[in-house]
C-alpha cells in the first residue's frame, strides 16, 4: 500500500511539473517587465483583479485552464491589483476589476470586463497570438 501511495504521489508530481512547463508566465505587474515583453513582441495578458471580487474569482480557474495550453507558453500574464494600482488603471483606462486586456507586443488586441465564459475568454486570449 505504501509503495502504491508513493508511486501515485510521484506520478502526480511529474504530471504537475510537466503541465507547469506549458503554463503561461504569471507575475505581478512590473512596468519594466511589461515593456520588455512588448519589445519582444510577446503575447501579453493584463489581468485586473481584486481579492474581494467574485467575478475575478470565477475568472481565475478559467484563465488557469486556458493559459496552461501549450499554445500560450509564451504568454506573459501580469496581475494588476485594482485596489492599489490606481495610477496604472487610469493610464490603461480601466474602470472596473475583472478587466482582461490582451496585447501582441505593443498593440492592444482586445479587452473585456466581467466575462467568465470560457469560450469568449479563449477568443480574447487568441487575439494575443
Residue ranges of model-derived segments:
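Bacterial N-terminal signal peptides that target proteins for export
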Residues: 1-9
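Bacterial N-terminal signal peptides
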Residues: 9-18
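A short beta-strand-turn-helix
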Residues: 26-42
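Short active-site neighborhood of thiol/selenol oxidoreductases, capturing the structured segment around
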Residues: 39-51
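Structural micro-motif
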Residues: 43, 92-101
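Thiol-based oxidoreductase modules, predominantly thioredoxin-like and allied folds used
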Residues: 48, 67, 72-86
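Typically the conserved alpha-helix immediately C-terminal to a functionally engaged Cys/Sec
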Residues: 57-71
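Non-catalytic, surface beta->alpha helical segment in thiol-disulfide oxidoreductase systems
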Residues: 101-129
Amino acid at each position: 500500500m505504501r509503495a502504491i501511495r508513493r508511486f501515485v504521489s510521484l506520478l502526480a508530481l511529474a504530471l504537475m511539473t510537466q503541465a507547469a512547463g506549458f503554463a503561461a508566465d504569471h507575475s505581478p505587474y512590473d512596468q519594466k517587465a511589461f515593456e520588455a515583453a512588448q519589445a519582444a513582441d510577446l503575447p501579453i495578458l493584463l489581468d485586473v483583479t481584486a481579492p474581494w471580487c467574485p467575478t475575478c474569482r470565477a475568472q481565475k480557474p478559467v484563465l488557469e485552464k486556458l493559459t496552461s495550453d501549450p499554445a500560450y507558453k509564451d504568454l506573459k500574464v501580469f496581475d494588476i491589483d485594482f485596489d492599489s494600482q490606481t495610477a496604472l488603471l487610469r493610464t490603461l483606462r480601466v474602470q472596473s476589476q475583472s478587466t482582461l486586456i490582451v496585447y501582441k507586443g505593443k498593440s492592444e488586441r482586445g479587452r473585456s470586463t466581467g466575462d467568465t465564459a470560457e469560450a469568449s475568454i479563449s477568443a480574447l486570449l487568441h487575439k494575443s497570438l
